Amino acid sequence: MPRSLKKGPFIDIHLLKKIQKSLKLTNKKSIRTWSRRSTIFPNMVGLTISIHNGRQHVPVFITEEMVGHKLGEFSITRTYRGHTADKKIKKPIK
């Protein structure tokens, strides 16, 4: 369900401070964050943000198409390992 328009987009304060600090510096180092709930703003375009997926930080390069989406949408938390194979041993028919 989308957020109400009268509330506006959400971003964690600590993440916003990290982004502003990174934009002032010349080196474009990756920003580590655990805030998957934060919305991507236009001033984040061009930055690499490492988003925590519960186990590790996944680096994501922010593009213009990502603006308005949440950071958590680009860091998958679940791994699908496929269905297990049938372990019944087939006996040869005599």
Swiss-Prot record:
MF-aspect GO terms: rRNA binding; structural constituent of ribosome
InterPro entries registered for this protein in UniProt: Ribosomal_uS19 (IPR002222), Ribosomal_uS19_bac-type (IPR005732), Ribosomal_uS19_CS (IPR020934), Ribosomal_uS19_SF (IPR023575)
GO biological process: ribosomal small subunit assembly; translation
Superkingdom in the source lineage: Bacteria
Record carries keyword RNA-binding: yes
A GO-annotated cellular component: cytoplasm
Family affiliation: Belongs to the universal ribosomal protein uS19 family.
Protein's job: Protein S19 forms a complex with S13 that binds strongly to the 16S ribosomal RNA.
Listed name of the protein: Small ribosomal subunit protein uS19
Organism: Buchnera aphidicola subsp. Cinara cedri (strain Cc)
Upper classification of the organism: Bacteria, Pseudomonadati, Pseudomonadota, Gammaproteobacteria, Enterobacterales
Gene behind the chain: rpsS
